[in-house]
Structure formats: C-alpha cells, structure tokens
C-alpha cells in the first residue's frame, strides 16, 4: 500500500492574530492572563495531585554579543532540568524547550532521581522540544521566529488555566511568547526590568539602608564614566582601582577594571583620567574589546563603583521567590567562587554553611508588592556589590 507522505504530515493552523510586541494591547492581554496566577499557584501548593502543565523555557535572553564570548553557552539551557523533579507529582506535565536536543542519557539521569515515580511514568508526562538551532540568538526569539513551533506548544497545552510559563530570565520577548501561548508567565513583569539592573539594585540597597560600595548609577557615556572615576578618587585619594559594570552584564563578563595611574588629585584629574582611560581600563571578558564594551555600555547603561580590596572576600548569593501577591520567600543561599585576574568572574559555587552571614527579610507591617520596599539585612557583611 502506498502512503502519501503529505497525508502523514502534521498540519497546524497558524494564527497571526497576536498583539504587536510592546503594544498597549499586549500589556492588557498579559495582565488578563496573569491575574489568576496567584490563585493557581496556591492551589497547587495545597493540592499536590492537582493536574497542571509547566512550560519550561531556559532561554538566556541576554546580550548576544557578550553571550557569544562564553564557551558552551548553549548548554546553560540544561540548568533548568532540575524542574523535571516536578514530575514526582503524578498529574504534572512538563514541556521543556531547548535550542538543540538534550541527550537522552542526561534526561534519564534526572528522571531516575524522582522519588516514588518510575522513569517510564515520568517520561509519558514529559515533552522535549527543540529548535535545532545552536546559534547565539535567544531561545525565545528562536521560538517566536517559528510559528509552527508556537502552535505545536499550544496544542500540547490541554488546559491553559492550569498551565504557566517559567523561564531562566525574563525580558519583553518572554512576555510576548506568554501572550502568544495564552498562558501566564511565572516571573516579574519586564516593565519592572530596571529594578533588577545594577543601577536599580544599587538604588534599592541604598534606600533600604544596606551598605554598598561607593559609586554612581545610571551612567551611559565615556564622559559619565570619567566623571564618576574622578569623583571616587577625590573622595578617596588612596583608591587604587574601580569597577565599571554594564547594567545587564552577567557572570562578571560585563565588567571592566580601571587602575588609577599616579596622577595628582587636582583640577586636571578628570582630564588625566580621560587621557589614560584606554590604557588603564581592562575588560574582564578577554574577547570583548573596549570599543564593544563602550558600545554595550551606551546601550545598557551601567555603574561605576570602588573595587573592593582585601585578602578574603566573600560573594554570597541568595535566591528569593516573589509570589504574584508580593510575598517574598528565601529559597536558598550559596557562596559564589570568583576567579579571573581581578576576581570578577563567576567560576563555581559552594553550598557550605556561611556561619558569619545570615540573610533575613524584615517585612513591614503592610506587605509591599515591590521588592525594593522589603528590608534586607546582611549581618557581618560590610558591603554588597553586584556582579
């Protein structure tokens, strides 16, 4: 019997009836699909056997020029495979999307860690999808560029009311995808993106009374950087180094170190710093030129702060979960191990107990929905900086 290949091919009705990215219509649609998320999450926390679907999107929606300098960046998408542990709940389904297929042996490794559930049972509730595209383009952008893949995901979502999208990081791209899929996004609205930047973070800490390195925020130009470097030097003539950081740099690769030359702290200080900037500024990412660094700095904005000196420096990290209702819970803490010439690059982490450091959230009587209004207290830690 002869079978027509076309008759076996899956067909999809591709819908182009989506609001334009960034439009008022998209923001309205996003708000509408997000309004019941808090109730749904509370339901799942109470009823472990409630059916639900999680669309896992480990997209690194970061600056692609900087990301391309990191070897093996595409494998960062495997970091969210820990979400497969949700399959221990027998009515939970997961749709996991990657740029390139994940090796079966890696998936099997995670599934065999599930307590009380066989790997075969979990496999039946797991769908792995791939774009078959190893380029440095954001995974979310790859999906949006493939309408058939978007429709495939939508067909796998049998109950949008019990489904949500969870991502590695959230940008307007993820917001657009959530609207196109018609499911809520478990994460902060990208409209609050500034609060998560280095400039926004410094302002949050300052307003919360947390000690942080002397520095300046919301800088964009070389002239801004020079003025900030000069102001720090005037405040502390013994200062040897300062750090210039892009707002949205990551793993330390968006940083540069400025080493002050032996110049007098006088009226010519700014001019001397400007003239020596190219010689005294060193980018942390070896493959990022100064030209590219300043170009990205103009696009993202950034900060300048003093370089923290000392033989023993700790870099604690805390992971917090902010519910749609504004409740903040601490999930975990760890100590970052930094390397590189100036100790700016994340290389590993340790979960060993940090006896001298305790992180406590002191909530106000009226719980705020904004993270920067929560009180953070770090004991025995004099300064907090942002990688």
Where would I find each of the regions flagged by the language model?
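ATP-binding N-terminal substructure of ATP-dependent carboxylate-amine bond-forming enzymes
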Residues: 1-196
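Flexible loop/turn segments at secondary-structure boundaries
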Residues: 63-65, 103-106, 173-174, 250-253, ...
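Short acidic, glycine/serine/threonine-rich loops at helix termini
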Residues: 68, 108, 177-180, 228, ...
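Glycine-rich beta-alpha junction loops
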Residues: 101, 246-250, 308, 322, ...
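N-terminal accessory/precursor segments of enzymes
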Residues: 172, 184-186, 192-194, 199-206, ...
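Active-site nucleotide/adenylate-binding loops and adjacent lid/helix of ATP-dependent enzymes
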Residues: 189-301, 350-367
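Beta-strand scaffold of nucleotide-dependent catalytic cores
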Residues: 256, 305, 314-336
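A long amphipathic alpha-helix within ATP-dependent nucleotide-binding catalytic cores
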Residues: 291-312, 316, 330, 342-387
């Amino acid at each position: 019997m002869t079978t027509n290949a076309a008759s076996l091919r899956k067909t999809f009705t591709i819908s182009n009836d989506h609001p334009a990215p960034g439009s008022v219509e998209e923001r309205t649609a996003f708000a509408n699909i997000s309004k019941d998320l808090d109730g749904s999450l509370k339901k799942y926390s109470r009823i472990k056997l409630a059916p639900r679907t999680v669309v896992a999107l480990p997209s690194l929606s970061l600056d692609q020029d900087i990301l391309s300098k990191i070897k093996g960046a595409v494998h960062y998408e495997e970091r969210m495979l820990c979400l497969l542990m949700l399959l221990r709940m027998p009515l939970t389904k997961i749709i996991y999307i990657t740029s390139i297929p994940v090796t079966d042996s890696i998936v099997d490794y995670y599934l065999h860690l599930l307590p009380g559930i066989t790997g075969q049972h979990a496999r039946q509730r797991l769908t792995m999808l791939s774009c078959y595209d190893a380029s440095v383009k954001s995974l979310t952008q790859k999906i949006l560029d493939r309408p058939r893949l978007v429709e495939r995901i939508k067909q796998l979502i049998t109950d949008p009311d019990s489904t949500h999208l969870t991502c590695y990081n959230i940008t307007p791209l993820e917001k657009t995808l959530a609207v196109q899929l018609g499911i809520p996004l478990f994460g902060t609205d990208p409209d609050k993106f500034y609060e998560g930047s280095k400039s926004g973070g410094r302002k949050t800490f300052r307003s919360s009374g947390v000690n942080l390195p002397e520095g300046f925020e919301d800088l964009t130009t070389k002239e801004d950087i020079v003025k900030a470097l000069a102001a720090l030097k005037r405040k502390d003539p013994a200062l040897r180094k300062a750090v210039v950081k892009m707002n949205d740099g990551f793993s330390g690769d968006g940083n540069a170190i400025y080493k002050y030359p032996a110049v007098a702290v006088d009226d010519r200080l700014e001019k001397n710093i400007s003239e020596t900037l190219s010689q005294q500024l060193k980018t942390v990412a070896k493959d990022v030129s100064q030209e590219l660094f300043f170009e990205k700095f103009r696009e993202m904005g950034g900060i300048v702060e003093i370089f923290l000196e000392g033989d023993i420096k700790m870099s604690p990290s805390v992971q917090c979960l902010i519910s749609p209702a504004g409740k903040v819970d601490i999930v975990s803490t760890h100590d970052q191990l930094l390397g590189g010439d100036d100790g700016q690059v994340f290389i590993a982490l340790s979960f060993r107990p940090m006896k001298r450091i305790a992180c406590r959230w002191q909530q106000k009587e009226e719980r705020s929905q904004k993270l920067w209004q929560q009180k953070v207290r770090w004991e025995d830690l004099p300064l907090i900086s942002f990688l």
